[in-house]
């Protein structure tokens, strides 16, 4: 079967954008919706936090299971399963009658997710190796754009159509993504019987760069911790910097989005540079840049200064995403690539759980600026680990 990987990339990008957006679009109005479900005001914050974190947590737990199934049945089938499953769970949120049903459906959304890692594995297995950095960098912008634009879309839809209708509209959009994936995405995959699938022990033996792979998982975790650790305190930090709360929500939205703009704009180009000079070098450069962005964030005096640093931080994200995914695709044996990407997604999801918890805990104990310093320490540790893992490649000036 002749595979048009460029068309697969386009449809996968659309799917990654809307599945990524569906995770984040509830952020602006979720506390209000929980309150409308009859929850006591004293418990709204608790249940809001649970409703957000339970999705990432359940997705992290089941991700390896779906990855293993993808290696047996195919990545396209898992993309269809994830899109169809999220169509049902997101749409059903419009009909929940209490906060406990909301938590159950948010939990099931995470359980049935997995579109993004399987799309990544699909494209990684089909794209020519010399274009893998560019292709995976382009694909990564879909998930990032969806995650960052999701709250804006959700807020606008809630304003225009009401809270419950947002979930119905989201379900319809995800249904369209399901249909596009069914009819437009192609994969030449021969199903493998369960007894013929290589074990994890055998898969580990076939990975020649295991320390590097573990380091890439940690980089994914740190990337998400850094991205989400400020989410509980950003609006409050901006209010303190500006001395006013009148426009703190608007400014915080702009500051969050500005990092996404630079990440989306730079990721394909940085992926292409990685194809030429070595993805490990681009990854190290991205980590160093993020360190030099996080440290001064603790000492800014105005929201504008914070916004400038967030803009440059986006270039770091644009460097890290394609580099991590491309290196994983090159390290992973073809018969286990979906499982490897599913473990990377597990670390990604755990980062989304750990980040807000770390940020709120540090801010409560030591103040808002300390959040950026603790995040910087995590990034610095990641740099040391990455330099150690890449030392032979750096000395011999070779690439994977």
Where do the protein language model's features map onto the residues?
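Central cavity-lining transmembrane alpha-helices of secondary-active solute carriers
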Residues: 50-66, 257-268
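Structural signature of the two symmetry-related core transmembrane helices
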Residues: 77-92, 171, 281-296, 376
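Cytoplasmic helix-loop-helix junction between adjacent transmembrane helices
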Residues: 105-143, 326-327
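Paired small-residue
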Residues: 89, 100-108, 293, 304-312
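Short amphipathic helix-loop junctions that connect adjacent transmembrane helices
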Residues: 29-45, 233-250
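Helix-loop junctions on the cytosolic side of multi-pass membrane transporters
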Residues: 178-195, 388-398
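Juxtamembrane intracellular "pre-TM" segments in multi-pass secondary transporters
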Residues: 1-6, 187-216, 400
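Conserved MFS/SLC helix-loop-helix module at the cytosolic interface between two early adjacent transmembrane helices
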Residues: 61-97, 274-280
């Amino acid at each position: 079967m002749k595979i048009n990987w460029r068309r697969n990339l386009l449809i996968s990008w659309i799917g990654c954008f809307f599945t990524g957006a569906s995770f984040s679009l509830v952020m602006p109005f979720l506390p209000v919706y929980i309150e409308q479900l009859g929850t006591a005001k004293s418990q709204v914050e608790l249940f809001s936090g649970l409703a957000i974190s339970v999705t990432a947590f359940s997705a992290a737990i089941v991700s390896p299971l779906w990855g293993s199934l993808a290696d047996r049945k195919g990545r396209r089938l898992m993309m269809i399963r994830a899109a169809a499953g999220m169509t049902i769970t997101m749409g059903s949120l419009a009909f929940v009658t209490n906060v406990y049903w909301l938590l159950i459906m948010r939990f099931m959304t995470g359980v049935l997710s997995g579109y993004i890692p399987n799309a990544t594995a699909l494209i990684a297995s089909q794209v020519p190796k010399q274009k893998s950095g560019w292709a995976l960098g382009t694909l990564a912008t879909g998930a990032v754009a969806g995650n960052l634009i999701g709250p804006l879309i959700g807020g606008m839809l809630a304003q225009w159509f009401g809270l419950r209708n947002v979930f119905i509209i989201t379900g319809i959009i995800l249904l369209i993504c399901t249909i596009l994936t069914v009819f437009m995405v192609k994969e030449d995959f021969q199903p493998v019987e369960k007894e013929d699938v290589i074990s994890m022990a055998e898969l580990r033996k076939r990975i020649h760069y295991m320390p590097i792979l573990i380091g890439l998982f940690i980089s994914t975790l740190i990337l998400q911790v850094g991205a989400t650790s400020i989410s509980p305190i950003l609006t409050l930090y901006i209010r303190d910097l500006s001395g006013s709360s009148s426009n703190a929500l608007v400014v915080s939205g702009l500051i969050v989005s500005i990092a996404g703009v630079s990440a989306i704009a730079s990721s394909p180009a940085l992926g292409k540079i990685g194809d030429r000079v070595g993805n490990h070098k681009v990854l190290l450069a991205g980590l160093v840049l993020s360190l030099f962005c996080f440290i001064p964030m603790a000492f800014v005096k105005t929201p504008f200064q914070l916004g400038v640093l967030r803009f440059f931080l986006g270039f770091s994200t644009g460097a890290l995403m394609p580099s991590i995914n491309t290196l994983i695709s090159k390290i992973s044996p073809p018969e286990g690539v979906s499982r490897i990407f599913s473990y990377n997604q597990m670390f990604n999801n755990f980062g989304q759980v750990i980040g807000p918890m770390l940020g709120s805990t540090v801010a409560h104990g030591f103040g808002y600026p300390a959040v950026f310093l603790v995040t910087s320490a995590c990034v610095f540790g990641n740099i040391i680990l990455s330099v150690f893992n890449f030392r032979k490649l750096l000395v011999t000036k070779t690439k994977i």
